[in-house]
């Protein structure tokens, strides 16, 4: 099966995890909330090359936890450890000690292609995009409401756009 590039982003909350995949070829968008089996099915069905911004240093660890069938609460621990570890990946890898090896799809991380390093918001501004933020705090300690999910989905889709080449 031919591989397509899918731009991907994830958002992690205490009780919710969202993945958005946007196919480069035709813009098809697939979103998956809190469903490890659907993520596995997506990977099996589409054999994607995943492209993102800071994917190797963040989203790949979140994806590994998802593929290990971890619940959103445990995925949030991975998220918080990544943020608190300040690039010390040995701390993050420690969360996966004793876990089976998980094969990730091929990954293109555009963060490492930009020198000097720039934040995604800075790139958005430099290419004339509007800056979109979510109004939902990432430290909310309850399941998201339907309205909050719509807001987070809008934000997550927008995060895929700066890396989506015309």
Labelled PLM ranges:
Residues 111-166:
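Acidic, Mg2+-coordinating catalytic module of metal-dependent nucleases/exonucleases
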Residues 9, 52, 159, 163:
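Short, conserved catalytic/metal-binding motifs centered on acidic residues
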Residues 3-12, 108-109:
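Two-metal-ion RNase H-like nuclease active-site motif
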Residues 25-122:
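Conserved DEDDh/DEDDy metal-dependent 3′-5′ exonuclease domain
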Residues 22:
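Short, acidic/hydrophobic/Gly-rich beta-strand patch recurrent on exposed beta strands
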Residues 14-19:
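Short N-terminal binding/cap micro-motifs at the start of the first secondary-structure element
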């Amino acid at each position: 099966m031919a591989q397509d590039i899918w731009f991907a982003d994830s958002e992690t909350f205490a009780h919710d995890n969202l993945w958005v995949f946007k196919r480069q070829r035709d813009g098809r968008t697939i979103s998956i909330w809190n469903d490890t089996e659907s993520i596995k099915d997506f990977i099996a069905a589409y054999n994607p090359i995943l492209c993102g911004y800071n994917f190797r240093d963040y989203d790949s660890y979140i994806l590994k936890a998802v593929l290990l069938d971890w619940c959103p609460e445990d995925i949030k621990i991975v998220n918080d450890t990544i943020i608190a570890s300040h690039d010390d990946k040995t701390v993050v890898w420690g969360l996966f000690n004793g876990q089976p090896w998980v094969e990730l799809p091929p990954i293109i991380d555009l963060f490492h292609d930009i020198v000097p390093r720039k934040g995604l918001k800075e790139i958005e501004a430099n290419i004339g995009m509007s800056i979109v933020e979510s109004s939902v705090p990432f430290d909310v300690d309850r399941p998201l409401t339907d309205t909050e999910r719509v807001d987070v989905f809008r934000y997550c889709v927008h995060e895929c756009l700066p890396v989506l080449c015309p």
